[in-house]
Amino acid sequence: MQMTYERFKWKTESKALPQNTVTAGSCRFTVLTERLIRIEYDSAQRFTDEASQVVFHRNFPESCFTVSECDGVTEIKTEYLTLKYKAGSCLTKETLSVELRQAPSTKWNFGEEIRQLKGTACTLDGINGALELEDGVCSRGGITILDDSCSLLLTEDGWFKNRESEETDCYVFAYGHDYKSCIADFYRLTGIPPLLPAYALGNWWSRYHRYTQQEYCDLIERFQK
């Protein structure tokens, strides 16, 4: 008997609009916004439409972009960026590039290290001194990468599974210095983090004062009001 996990099922919209996707050889590009592009590479063209542990929503509105081919190079152009890929090739710094069309006019070649502004730390437990932060999605250079290649995929019954192959699955955030829009679209892609309702936290009160019993009673009555 197969177990179901209804309570663990996430609401996802993982399949992108067909008109936002471009396939060139073993690569599939999904233009989620004019500044956010998903890049997939799989030699067998086994591309993934399922949600992952990181990415829940790819059903973005139709994007405005053009596609052209010249001398074996596929070019995707939006108002904000130009992506070039040498069709039929593996992903290397010579075969794939993304360039901003506006300031700071950064060009990123696949595999190059990106100096990010970093993100957050999950916990400060056991930390005494400096802490290396996790990668974020903002950069002074204007281009960052979210690599989703190693995350598990979500199944229809609310469980997880491994990917069928060691494919490349990453997202290019080309937002320049518009950090607010970058983070907003990151949450559109991954979903808003769930928050505990305020009532579940109870009353939090901290004050260095020697309360009497009556003062505690008065304080609780204030909270009730």
What are the residue ranges of the model-derived segments?
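A low-complexity, Ser/Thr/Gly/Pro-enriched, surface-exposed linker/loop concept
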Residues: 5-7, 32-71
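Short, hydrophobic/aromatic-rich segments at coil-to-beta transitions
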Residues: 13-21, 71-75
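Short, Gly/Pro- and small/polar-rich lid/capping loops
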Residues: 2-16
